[in-house]
């Protein structure tokens, strides 16, 4: 059973002090962050079976045609829920070994994500990974591949299909659209950033994820910084702080 209070007790005070100091060093007064609470625990709850099932129950009340699982092979019950609701099950992955495991588990679509991808990603580049996965899964069946990771333009999509993909899976680009819930100031930073202004960092979730280089990511790279905690503890450290930053940024705080 999910117990947010138990997770809170697993987070050392050092982490609450560190996140608070990072914000205060950049002119943000956040004394409340020196106390660890259950803020940010919804992420942890949603990674548990009960939380995931509750989300899928809501999702399947709508006419969706695909669900996607990440950070591991989807459990049998999730794949079965997809079949029962005439919905394809996709899996995000970052290595050829992961691709084979996903095909054996019975997923319908492989979203093969290179290290250029925003969010959680591995260390293998898209150009290397797509043909490697395409070749690796041949003995196990004809499962379509969607290439992901640094793909925005038609030229990039065409290149992905030339390497064996059936299509492309775009993610970060949609965060900059009018329909996106991302704050306008963050959208502007994303559009303005070049390819050298992102970093794979464990500072947000405890697992490597690509994000914009910010004072937050830089602080966690410092020699004096504590080692990021494993998932789901690190999100409980990071999310309350980052949500405060986003709120202030939306209000004009630099």
Annotate the PLM regions.
Residues 1-140:
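Active-site entrance/lid segments in N-terminal catalytic domains of soluble metabolic enzymes
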Residues 2-19, 120-146, 152-254:
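Conserved active-site-proximal phosphate/metal-binding subdomains
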């Amino acid at each position: 059973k999910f117990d947010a209070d138990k997770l809170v007790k697993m987070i050392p005070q050092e982490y609450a002090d560190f996140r608070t100091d990072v914000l205060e060093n950049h002119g943000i007064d956040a004394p409340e962050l020196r106390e660890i609470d259950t803020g940010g625990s919804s992420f942890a709850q949603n990674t548990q079976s009960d939380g995931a099932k509750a989300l899928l129950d809501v999702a399947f009340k709508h006419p969706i045609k695909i669900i996607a699982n990440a950070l591991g092979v989807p459990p049998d019950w999730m794949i079965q829920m997809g079949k029962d609701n005439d919905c394809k099950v996709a899996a995000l992955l970052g290595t050829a070994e992961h691709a084979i495991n996903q095909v054996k588990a019975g997923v319908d679509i492989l979203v093969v994500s290179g290290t250029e991808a925003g969010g959680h990603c591995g260390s293998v580049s898209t150009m290397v990974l797509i043909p490697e996965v395409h070749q690796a899964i041949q003995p196990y069946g004809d499962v379509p591949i969607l290439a992901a990771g640094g793909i925005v333009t038609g030229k990039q999509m065409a290149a992905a299909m030339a390497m064996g993909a059936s299509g492309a899976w775009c993610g970060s680009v949609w965060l900059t659209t009018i329909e996106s819930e991302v704050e306008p100031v963050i959208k502007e930073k994303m559009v303005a950033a070049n390819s050298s202004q992102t970093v794979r960092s464990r500072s947000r979730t405890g697992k490597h994820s690509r994000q914009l280089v910010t004072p937050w990511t830089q602080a966690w790279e410092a020699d004096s910084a504590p080692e990021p905690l494993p998932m789901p503890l690190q999100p409980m450290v990071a999310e309350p702080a980052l949500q405060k930053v986003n709120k202030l940024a939306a209000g004009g705080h630099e």
